[in-house]
């Protein structure tokens, strides 16, 4: 598709046959769409990046990853899509970091240092589309 020498470093589709362990949670097709996923299996040497759209729904969120740690730093981000107020997340997120509950209803970045227990991460309410982005320095997330 790309003719340039470095075109092999451009990803336009999510990782195929992504295997998620039991502790990793699951994404409901009714409430989310994983649009991109990158790790060292997709491009050798790449680090972990994931992009997911979450859609408004009345469906209860049961997809949260269990509490876990990584040997690398991670950034978890959620972005609101209201053009008139980009800080309005259009959702309420419950994110546990080191056992402490954080209720967040505005666009945010959460830096999770290596070795810190994080999750569960629950979407308690969602009224507008929300874009989720996560990146970590590890070569694979799962």
Where are these regions (language model features)?
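A short beta-strand-loop-beta hairpin characteristic of the jelly-roll/cupin
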Residues: 80-105
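Conserved metal-binding segment of the jelly-roll/cupin
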Residues: 100-123
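Residue-level recognition of well-ordered beta-strand positions that form the cores
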Residues: 52, 78-80, 96, 133-136
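Residues at beta-strand starts and edge strands
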Residues: 47, 73-75, 91, 128-129
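Short, flexible loop/turn elements at secondary-structure junctions
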Residues: 73, 81, 114-116
């Amino acid at each position: 598709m790309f003719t340039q020498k470095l075109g092999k470093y451009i990803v336009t589709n999510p990782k195929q046959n992504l295997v998620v362990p039991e502790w990793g949670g699951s994404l409901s097709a009714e409430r989310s769409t994983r649009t991109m996923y990158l790790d060292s299996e997709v491009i050798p040497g790449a680090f972990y990046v994931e992009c997911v759209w979450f859609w408004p729904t009345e469906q209860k969120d049961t997809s949260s990853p269990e509490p876990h740690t990584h040997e690398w730093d991670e950034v978890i981000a959620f972005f609101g899509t209201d053009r008139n107020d980009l800080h309005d997340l259009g959702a309420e997120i419950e994110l546990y970091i080191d056992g402490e509950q954080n209720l967040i209803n505005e666009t945010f970045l959460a830096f999770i240092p290596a070795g810190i227990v994080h999750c569960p991460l629950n979407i308690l309410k969602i009224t507008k589309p929300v874009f989720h982005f996560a990146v970590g320095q590890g070569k694979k997330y799962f």
